Amino acid sequence: MMNIAFKQAHSGNYRRAARGKEDIRYLVLHFTANDGDTAKNNADYFARAEISTSAHYFVDENEVWQSVHDADIAWHCGTRGTYFHPYCRNANSIGIELCSRKNGEKFYFMPETVRRAQALTRELMAKYGIPLEKCCAPLRCYAQKLSCAVRRERIRVDSIQAGVTEKGGT
């Protein structure tokens, strides 16, 4: 089991709930679209003030921080009723943010960030019985005016999925 630090997000950034194992059906992999941020920086940021957005986990090359309990609903995959996946919703998913780096206009991840995200993804898939095909990457970032690098730079969840299946995932 991974060592995961916890710092509760501000109450205005998520919705308290009592989701059970059967309620969580998707993992949504995002990235922060920052240059050199850390998991702890993100946990601190989401704890400070109400910004009406959040994720459950933040992953960098050194550690993983959780800011919303799995049973609660983080606001990470759609804004005010606008969703980009036919079935995945905030209420039935867990959001994982990978801390990114930037070289010119291209975002990338440190290799250890990818390894930690793979391990976290495997752990959550096993815990909630989530199949690999229900691990999603979004088509947009938090800032609507930015073209999400997951799509623009063709950074996808392939490397994370490969690591999941290599280590005995589903």
Locations of regions flagged by a protein language model:
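Short coil-to-beta-strand
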Residues: 87-98
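N-terminal catalytic cores of peptidoglycan-degrading enzymes
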Residues: 1-89
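Basic/polar, cationic surfaces and motifs that engage anionic cell-wall
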Residues: 1-8, 16, 21, 99-170
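Hydrophobic/aromatic pocket-lining and membrane-interface residues
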Residues: 57, 96, 117
